[in-house]
Curated annotation (Swiss-Prot):
CDD domains: homeodomain. This is Homeobox protein cut-like ceh-44. The gene is ceh-44. Residues 591-681, 832-919, 978-1065, 1103-1162 bind DNA. Pfam families: CUT (PF02376), CUX1_N (PF25398), Homeodomain (PF00046). It comes from Caenorhabditis elegans.
Amino acid sequence: MEIVSRAWESVDWDRIQTRVEAEVTALGQRQDDSEIRKTRLVEESNAYRGRTNKDSRKVAIPLIKAFQSEFDGLLARSTAAENALIDICKSIVSLPDPKSLLKGAEAWKNDAEKTQKAVEEREELKRQLIKVNNELEDLRGKDVKVRKLKDKLAKLESEQDIFIENAVNEVEKKAEQELNDRLTELIAEKEKMKEQNEILEKNMDSLESKNKDIQRKLEIAKQTVEQKDGLENEQLSIAMKDLADAKHKIVFLEERVSQLENEAEKVNESKKAGNIEDIAALGSVLVQKDDVIQQLTNDIKRHEASHVEELAKWKLAVSAVEKKNKTLIGELNELKNQLESRNDYEAIKNELRLLREIEFGDSAEANAESIERLGETVETLDRLLAEKNRRLQNENASLRVANDGFKGDEVMKAIVSGSHSRVVETVGKRVGAEEANSYRQKNTDSELIEKIQEAKRNKAVCELKFEDPTINVLTYLKNQKAKEAGKRDAPTPILAAPVTPKHVTKLGTHTITTTALPPRTQTAETTQSILQRLSNGSNKHLLNEDLKLSTVLNLKRFSGNPAKPLEAKTSEEQKAELETIEKMQKRIQVNVQALNGHPLNTTEIASHCKRLMIAYNIGQRLFAKHVMNQVVKSQGSLSELLSKPRHWNKLTDKGREAFRRIYGWISDDEAINLLCSLSPRRVWPADQNIEHPKAETLLDTSDPMEFKEEPVIRYDVTPKVEPVIEKIKSPVESPCSSQAGASSLRASRWRHDDISKEKILSILQTELKKIEEETTESKVVVPVKPTATGGNRRFSSNSTYESSSLTGKSRPSTVELILKQRISTGLQPLTQAQYDAYTVLDTDFLVKQIKEFLTMNSISQRQFGEYILGLSQGSVSDLLARPKTWAQLTQKGREPFIRMQLFMDDVEASEENDEKQPKITICDEDSDLAKTLATLLNAVHREPSEPKTSVKLEPLSEIDVIMQVPSASKPSSVVKSIDESSGEEILDTFEIVYQVKGILEENGISPRVFGDEYLHCTSSMCADLMIRTKSFENSKASEKLMYTRMKTFLSDPIAIPLLVEKEESKETVKAKIESVPAPREAPRPVKRKHSSDTDDYDLNTKKPIQRTVITDYQKDTLRFVFVNEQHPSNELCEQISLKLDMSLRTVQNWFHNHRTRSKAREKEGKVYSDALPNGTAVKSLTWKDDLQKMLDEAPAITSQWAPDYQNRAGSVKSSTSADSPTNNNYSSPIFSFDKASTTSTVKKPSSTGKLDNLVARMIRLAEGREAAAAKAS
């Protein structure tokens, strides 16, 4: 004690405190100097970044790293000085304190008193231990009882299983016996069942549905039994586990008791030793042990109560299982009775299968071969019969129409009767060789003439190869006869005219060809007889002779482009093809540059492009390869682009470039010719002129300031009927017609050359079907067919195609209304009632029904999945391609099928409501189609001078029709009713919002401007009214006022121009602000900048949609994952999106796209290097650890380019300079000292602070330094 007191008295406290305060002051001064220097370094780095580019900064990186190493050395020196001060303070603190010894003396007295109390508590613990031992003996006895109960339960379960098996076996034996008896009776009654086949076909559907219900019940019963068995096994396993846990706890208690006994003995020994400190520690231990014993006692009691409850539950479960078995036995009996009543199902099924095979062939049986060939499962018999009946009715109606058209037509009478050779000669005499030659194919005629002249020069006409498919047999023989007649007599008028052979005659979509000569085995007599038949024009039995002639000559039909063996292209052909492609690309590029950034009418361009590709038989793959020039790489992308063209203002840069290239092709006749020369299927109707659009009609000239009246839409079916009438008309009916009419009739003479009766009837039937479909289904006007000029194959259109919205009277279809409702309400979660309503569904039938529905209504899988199922396109495709059975699906897997069934129920209910309403049909019956067409044609011929307004619209998909809004709608259509009591109008809020949205979108007006300027409400309230629309009755007073203003807006013609001006002025101001050069512009690595050509457009056009751009580091990380795992899990995708600051959908789409491209490259035998880091595939077993490191480093790398200085616990941030206007234009500094830390910055202490506070602050400072160093390492 004396030594300690002397040591404390010799300490000079004033000197030590003065020294510590001086050191702290120096530390604060050094810290301030360091902050000033770092601030200056940050400013200099920002200035350096603004003055230099990336390349020059790369050169300066070594210098920056040298500065960093010097900075680290200075920090180390500063840390050493601070550690010295801390050591001094610690040495002061480590001096012994004499006060603690004095306080310890008082504590010893208290410990002695506690020791006496501990002895008394030890005696009490002994008594408690005796009680615990007694309770343990009781627990051992209860364990034996539990084992007996478990054995009894096992015995009861085995007996129950044996009873169930015996009952099932008996039922099966009885069912088999009854089925065998019934089969013998069915064999005897087979002949009677054939007579009742018609009745059974009508009842087949009901039998199949009942059979499916029985199968579903059997599956449900089987599932319930399996679930019960599984539940019982699970409960038994839980009970066994609980018993085992109780046993382990008992063993554990025994061990604990033995430990307590040992500790008690040690306590006794320590008492004898008389160590005061051990006695104090033992007291605390005993208190803890007492608590543990009390807790164990409570656990044992609780387990005993739980065991009693479990035994009661098991008894109830056993009784429930017995009851369930009784019910199952009853259900089995019912099923047995139902099977007895349906035992003739197999015989009926076999008979119907035989009927299907006889009537419908391969489509009757659903085997693997037929499914692979047909691509779908077998259709039901009623559907097949209905299709056959419909097909026969259409054929019958077409034949009646053709028969009516043939009456009074001399040419068609001659063709039907078979004497078409006389028709050919008669028309040839009347028309003349000059007019006929003008409608021939010049190339074909010249080729044939050259071949004939070559044969004459070789003097081997008789030895000509008759197998040559390019020579017309009849024309050749006529020429031979004319030559012989010319030698004997003067040339006749008919044979004097040079009748050159026609190579191929085309009619519509069919190719009418001549036949080839037989091999050179015919005798001279046979040839002479053939010539005599051809020259005899007055023979009455010309048809029979022609048939005999075709038999003798063994006539064969061949195509206009005969199939030739595939030969490798020569170098000259490849060079010519490359020159053609280069020439076409140059013309397209010139046409694109001539646009000068002008917006295009995408709908018209897509329509004309599809029409020209179909007319010239150009494949989409060839078009995408040579015309799109890598803008659209795949056939599917081109099909999507043409089938659903988006508005020009909604297209990305890539989409606009695609439509520019399409424009450059369809607006240039030479480019079209060049692509046709590249097409391997160069086949088009040579006798028809194909219309090319003018370049002016493809430009987007719409102006939101102009509001034109809606043109009257007329259903002009003349262009579709005209080709059929040209084929049916006779040249005798209109002898005084104009030159154009005569030309068309003379052209039809060559189209009908060598056409059989069956071919003409089939062509007429096909054309009439097309007219019927387009007349009954289309809601848009077909463009008027312009007149042909001369013999040109192509010409430019003289009529412009203007888009027109549907009239107010034409309402959307049932499917459109349902989809519109689903889009407005969104995807609602399923209720329990809906789950209960569809406990079992036939997934195969439902998927087939959905496929047919989507195909019939032109709904894409993406739209169906997004608005109906809430799934992606890939998930919908998997569901529809490979549906699982209902029993194999989980609760989550059944949800999409339930949504499909609910959707189909809504469609059926809406269709039933529509059937109750009166309908307006164009043709009541198929037989009235010809009369309707004739009436329309007569009206057209009577008023040839009446101007027509023809508007061509692209066929819209269901979603496009929903989103399309009429430009003018009547306000009265948005009023549902009028309240009689108050006289208030009850408005149709959904219709009002639907129309207002369409008008705003059509004119490019934002909801913010609409709400501020017209509704006089906030933008949030306007958006809420648009998105979450309520009914008028459930709306508030303020909301009703807004809906009333919207209704007024629909009938206010002045409001739209005013809002457009506001929108334009707003965009103009914004454009001026953006055009001002900012001193410092923040980089935007995530979003793509606006297109460069948008500055050339008007300000009222909408801005292009910005698309997500992936940075290089994000790409490298995604490629690294793709190499090691092409199908990452959702958790991994979420982690990647979180660390790389990307959306989850972007990450998933990236992997999906690269998987698809990788598979395509693998099919081609190539390696997909785009998804490989540095072009090489390096897999690693520890790729997950490497990925984690990359993700951890991602924020530091993506946010800055320079190395990150690790500073101390405080944060040094550079503030914005005075000349920077906003924080958005602030550029991050090169040197960043931001570091997340929870420690506080050291402040200067006051000179009057106490020594303890100073020491505590120094210790916190040291801890902060250590934490920063640990994070940096």
